[in-house]
Amino acid sequence: MDVNPTLLFLKVPAQNAISTTFPYTGDPPYSHGTGTGYTMDTVNRTHQYSERGRWTKNTETGAPQLNPIDGPLPKDNEPSGYAQTDCVLEAMAFLEESHPGIFENSCIETMEVVQQTRVDKLTQGRQTYDWTLNRNQPAATALANTIEVFRSNGLKANESGRLIDFLKDVMESMDREEVEITTHFQRKRRVRDNVTKKMVTQRTIGKKKHRLNKRSYLIRALTLNTMTKDAERGKLKRRAIATPGMQIRGFVYFVETLARSICEKLEQSGLPVGGNEKKAKLANVVRKMMTNSQDTEISFTITGDNTKWNENQNPRMFLAMITYITRNQPEWFRNILSIAPIMFSNKMARLGKGYMFESKSMKLRTQIPAEMLANIDLKYFNDSTRKKIEKIRPLLIDGTASLSPGMMMGMFNMLSTVLGVSILNLGQKRYTKTTYWWDGLQSSDDFALIVNAPNYAGIQAGVDRFYRTCKLLGINMSKKKSYMNRTGTFEFTSFFYRYGFVANFSMELPSFGVSGINESADMSIGVTVIKNNMINNDLGPATAQMALQLFIKDYRYTYRCHRGDTQIQTRRSFEIKKLWDQTRSKAGLLVSDGGPNLYNIRNLHIPEVCLKWELMDEDYQGRLCNPLNPFVSHKEIESVNNAVMMPAHGPAKNMEYDAVATTHSWVPKRNRSILNTSQRGILEDEQMYQRCCNLFEKFFPSSSYRRPVGISSMVEAMVSRARIDARIDFESGRIKKEEFTEIMKTCSTIEELRRQK
């Protein structure tokens, strides 16, 4: 039967139909192949926006650098990065005038953080450029490798465990004439297999020492590796994102801490808050503008879009901002904060994997690594790629491109928000000195601008002034993509405002369903998502009840745990039927053991085990939650667990759910296919790391031991703990004298070995 889809909307207010226009059902698009082309696009575009700047050469690396700061102001509407230093400083001064003491207080807060932060802060985060291996690694491994190299080069400040001391090592490493690193490489040998008598390739992993001179080391320390951003919906073209190395990360963290502290005190900032708190902040600004425009004024709102925010920002501008913000602070603090923008002014973009070539006739595939792009004959490339390579060639050094202007995606979100808010702040009447005035909201590159004026001409004048002020600070409001409505209807960071925020339910669609962690977590996350959407996103009771039934169905199909009395045959049905038949109280069985579903929309907040506990047979309780049962996982689980939810846009969100440890809370093992590759050496390092940590946790069994504050090593801590435990166990009669003596002897041997080392 054909249904005219417009009939669906006859009774629905227009604003509630927003959900239907979002591209958020189904799988998001992922990128394949290399990101080299996207990265070259970014580098070339960034230079084009600043092309009328001044060229200089970096004295250490020889990289050509373009500086657009205080460059010629644009005559047209094309995006450009010519920010004017004096304007930025003045905007900062006015921001401070409107918020007395804001910079001072934020500096004091940040100084405390700087002195307390430990180096393990840098292990957070996913992929990180590992400069020792010249490719991406998990953050913890990259940090471990960096520290290992530093120590073998005699840089030992990091041993205190404080981040600031690690950064001292980073600064000292940049003055070294050479740095010695260990690289992993792979040897292949053809040998004859004794059994099958065939030739096979044997791989062995070797480690070798390798010296980097000052120039090579600096290039690596200043390198951002690039990847393609995955899972971006609603875009035809992919784009490149950057991941910085460990030398840059620590400095960026402190700058962002300062900027975050400032953003928290600014009512126009959409960061660092999120969710309902953000909506409340926005609603306040709107209310303020509406209240003041009741009789004489008209009020309009621009749903704003900036052209290429990151590519027109400039690290030199951020340096000026930081210099101003910290002007009355101690020298050490000012120095440590100014290093991140200085490093970004000298950054190099790694071009990624390079290009893949296929010859259809000869069935050959070959990869052209990025390092070769500087001197390969361009006849092999198509027109668009040829143009890109020609343009980027003058900037290339060792397969990386010098990229002085621009900030890669997501590096200084907080600080760039401060810059944006400083323009919104200038809209007060005491600064505009005329009849129009403005206010608004800023969250990284997204903004909403509310302009009030006595008449339309005033509104137009206000918008023009805002537009031109932005240009002075290197921000380019897009006239094509921004649109204006009477205040009361606008969109900001995918929140749709229409006399109040409209629930944009489609954005939550990807997080419904079975997550695939394990039976216990999935049940808990599934009902929590439904509960949260009833609270935050206008999910009504009838729809929620339906969502719940669909979820349970989905869950049963995923884990093949249909009810014990069902006719559906699956791999597990034999076991489940057996359990069903021998259980007296069938209502007590968990859904994942073939039990009935007892959830409805009134009890979503109760973990399933608690909901059914009173209904369970005693022996079932004993098997399900007995800590001595080898299948009950107590390793990861605390009373509240975190799941990473992927919302339809924006970063992955952490979602809390209640976790009860049962036989269903298993943790799956990792895929081992990595063992045959050149990564194997790294994996072995990682396993050793893992073993040490596991051993350490055995000595300190509480899952939440406090971080050791002293400088004693892990080994010393374990030895002293072993001695204390042994003495207590011996005195209480839990162990025999011989065992006690043996433990003490082992401890002394370990200490002796450490001394000899």
Curated annotation (Swiss-Prot):
UniProt-annotated location(s):
Host nucleus; Host cytoplasm
Task: Give the record's keywords alphabetically.
Answer: Eukaryotic host gene expression shutoff by virus, Eukaryotic host transcription shutoff by virus, Host cytoplasm, Host gene expression shutoff by virus, Host nucleus, Host-virus interaction, Inhibition of host RNA polymerase II by virus, Nucleotide-binding, Nucleotidyltransferase, Phosphoprotein, RNA-directed RNA polymerase, Transferase, Viral RNA replication, Viral transcription
One of the entry's Gene Ontology molecular-function terms is: RNA binding
Task: Write out the ranges of the annotated region (Promoter-binding site).
Answer: 249-256
Where is the short sequence motif Nuclear localization signal located?
A: 187-195, 203-216
**Gene Ontology BP term (one):** symbiont-mediated suppression of host gene expression
Query: What interactions and quaternary structure are annotated?
Result: Influenza RNA polymerase is composed of three subunits: PB1, PB2 and PA. Interacts (via N-terminus) with PA (via C-terminus). Interacts (via C-terminus) with PB2 (via N-terminus); this interaction is essential for transcription initiation. Interacts (via C-terminus) with human PKP2 (via N-terminus); the interaction competitively inhibits the interaction between the RNA polymerase subunits PB1 and PB2.
Q: What function does this protein fulfil?
A: RNA-dependent RNA polymerase which is responsible for replication and transcription of virus RNA segments. The transcription of viral mRNAs occurs by a unique mechanism called cap-snatching. 5' methylated caps of cellular mRNAs are cleaved after 10-13 nucleotides by PA. In turn, these short capped RNAs are used as primers by PB1 for transcription of viral mRNAs. During virus replication, PB1 initiates RNA synthesis and copy vRNA into complementary RNA (cRNA) which in turn serves as a template for the production of more vRNAs.
Q: What is the name attached to this protein's record?
A: RNA-directed RNA polymerase catalytic subunit
Gene, per the UniProt record: PB1
